[in-house]
């Protein structure tokens, strides 16, 4: 790892290991101000290894970033035993449950409902797992309209329509994610809104 990646991993590891939860079911959270070329996917996976996480869920508004997450996991020798689950790739039922895995998906897909207003059948398994960590990639990216435009510009019409149906607002927070986890890792190259709002305290931020 580069020095800045190692610094981010070390600070996050120490916070997660030493911070006590106020309640048993509380989730700890940490924010990385991951500027361009920081190498957030590689550093995130190194943190997962150091924390000994086995089940990691990566959620993003922009499915187009999947390739970066998938390639870093599959092509680097450090993660040779890890498996990668995605919408159009390997599925949960196909993996070796004894080995660690990463599931990549979009907010709009995992928060979307079927016609009956219930969790989509294909995503039910993800709601039955207590994840070691949920990584929120570019979570604080822009306003609702900026997010919608960015998704539309990728040409992925299904994701765009799903985003509009879910109706994710600018005040969207982790409490409405119907999936449980012990840790949240927020990744953002533009975390200004989160920093200004006081959502994170200094010990929860790598800047």
Label the model's feature ranges.
Residues 107-109, 124-186, 190-191:
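SF2 helicase catalytic motif II
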Residues 66-69, 111-115, 143-145, 193-198:
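Switch/connector loops and helix/strand junctions flanking conserved nucleotide-binding motifs
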Residues 24-25, 96-99, 116-132, 176:
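Short basic/glycine-enriched coil/helix segment immediately N-terminal to the Walker B
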Residues 41-77, 109:
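Conserved Walker A/P-loop ATP-binding site and its immediately adjacent core
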Residues 1-26:
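N-terminal pre-P-loop "Q-motif" helix
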Residues 175-176, 182-183, 194-207:
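Interdomain helical connector at the RecA1-RecA2 junction of SF1/SF2 helicase-like NTPases
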Residues 77-118:
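Inter-Walker segment of RecA-like/P-loop motor cores
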Residues 21-47:
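Walker A/P-loop
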């Amino acid at each position: 790892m580069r020095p800045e990646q190692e610094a981010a991993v070390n600070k996050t590891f120490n916070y997660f290991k030493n911070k006590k939860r106020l309640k048993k079911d509380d989730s700890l959270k940490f924010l990385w101000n991951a500027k361009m070329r920081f190498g957030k996917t590689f550093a995130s996976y190194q943190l997962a290894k150091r924390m000994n996480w086995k089940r990691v869920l990566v959620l993003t508004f922009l499915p187009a970033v999947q390739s970066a997450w998938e390639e870093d996991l599959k092509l680097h020798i450090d993660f040779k035993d890890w498996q990668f689950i995605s919408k159009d790739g390997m599925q949960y039922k196909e993996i070796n449950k004894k080995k660690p895995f990463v599931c990549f998906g979009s907010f709009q897909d995992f928060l979307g409902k079927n016609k009956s207003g219930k969790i989509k059948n294909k995503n039910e398994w993800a709601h039955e797992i207590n994840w070691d960590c949920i990584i929120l990639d570019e979570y604080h990216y822009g306003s609702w309209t900026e997010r919608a435009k960015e998704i539309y510009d990728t040409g992925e019409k299904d994701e765009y329509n799903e985003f509009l149906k879910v109706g994710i607002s600018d005040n969207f927070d982790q409490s409405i994610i119907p999936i449980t986890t012990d840790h949240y890792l927020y990744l953002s190259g533009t975390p200004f809104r989160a920093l200004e709002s006081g959502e994170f305290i200094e010990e929860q931020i790598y800047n």
